[in-house]
Amino acid sequence: LGDVYKRQDYIENNLDSEISYDEAAQIACCSTYYFQRMFTYITGISLAEYIRRRRMTQAAFELQRTDKRVLEVALKYGYTSPTSFNRAFQNVHGISPIAAKDIGSTLNAYPAIKFSVHITGGSAMSYHIEEKGAMRIVGVRTPLVEDFETNIKSVPIFWQHTLTTVQFNQICSFTHKEPKGVLGISIYQNPNNIFYYIAASTDALVPEGMYEYEIPATTWVIFENDGYFKESVQSVFRRFYTEWLPFSGYEYAGLPDIEVYPVVEDGTIHGHSEVWIAIKKKKENT
């Protein structure tokens, strides 16, 4: 968890200055996109929301214990507009910054997140590890951005639309190669090329309006999951990062993660699903 502590220290030490997501991601040894994704899965809130809560917590402390004007505190925590600071402050505390100066006012304090590994009698995670060759996928896609908070909202809308299209039926007809099923895949190539695919693993020609992508050969840890879509899949990712990965002897490979939704005979997606996450063996310290 060394890198986790370092990136957390970076955020806490820069609440009153500019926080670079790129620099935080470098500390975490991954892309900005994957860093935000990992943070959200582990903590349950977006990185942007966490930073906002921490800054507003510190701002409230300063307003109550010092004689600083509201504008001074707003500027310190990166808000050049009193209106935007007032809005952010009220979203966290439910009252205005001026009202917060009253000693009797009730405020919300969000402490810094402390990452640790807890030993519990929790439920088992069913998994197996497989080495697979290169995988070619074909399907439809929608662009994503580096802001994971925005993507969380846009991907479900993309699913809802795609399920009603002829293209989805074509994708279902391609689901004969491993991993068998309709695949949901986030693919990060660079900050300007991030896409979410609804696709299938296939050798078929690419139909008009669809795209192909090849995922290189790698080792996968595969988790089985009996829930439906977003809530259950995100739970698998959270447990992967917090419960499985720290003790496994592996590290995250940084390749696209795959959600696998098997298709039943009537062409609908079944509730049982799998999550495929690319991993690699940790380098031993010498």
Which sequence ranges carry the predicted segments?
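…primarily DNA-binding HTH/wHTH and HhH modules…
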Residues: 6, 87-135, 149
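Terminal helix-turn-helix DNA-binding modules in bacterial transcription factors
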Residues: 9-22, 41-77, 104-123
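Short coil turns linking two alpha-helices in DNA-binding domains
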Residues: 31-34, 80-81
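Structural motif
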Residues: 128-143, 213-226
